[in-house]
Amino acid sequence: LYHTSLVDTVNERHFAAVLPEVFESCFVNMNIGDRYESFVAKELPSTIHNMFACISDDRKYNYVSGFSNGGYGCLHSALKYPSTFSKVGAFSAGDKADSVFVNDNSTKAKNRILLFGDKDIHNTDYCLTYLADKLIADNKKALAPDIYHACGSLDPWLDMNHIVRDYFLEHNDFYNY
């Protein structure tokens, strides 16, 4: 990370950047496997705030960001745990619920089953629009995180990103694309 814009920005703006290893977990508690959602959204923030008194636990100072699977994961974490994160930077972050699942015994299918199971994940906590709808229905819109979402025009998952974009532009005022 040395000699990167991240290090320069951290030094210039005086904030802590924590980059946990979450493999290809999408920051979720896996159907079969590790509990990355609990780690990223609960354990890690608690550990950081307990170990480093200079890092505030006030949600307004706690952001989550990610790219691709991590982009989905950071949106998932912030929408499911709105009292933890106030802002999201989601890059190339489509909703995994919008990805067609074919159980063809491929590595991709096996990984999807490990993460989410073999059922449709719409209307579950794995679906970003479901989590956002739940946040609004539970009258917690004031806790909704500010979302910055970006995706390059040549990204192979651009269509999935546009589905997420269109949903948030239609339903929420805390979203920027």
Where are each of the predicted segments found?
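Non-catalytic cap/lid and distal C-terminal segments of serine-dependent acyl enzymes
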Residues: L1-Y177
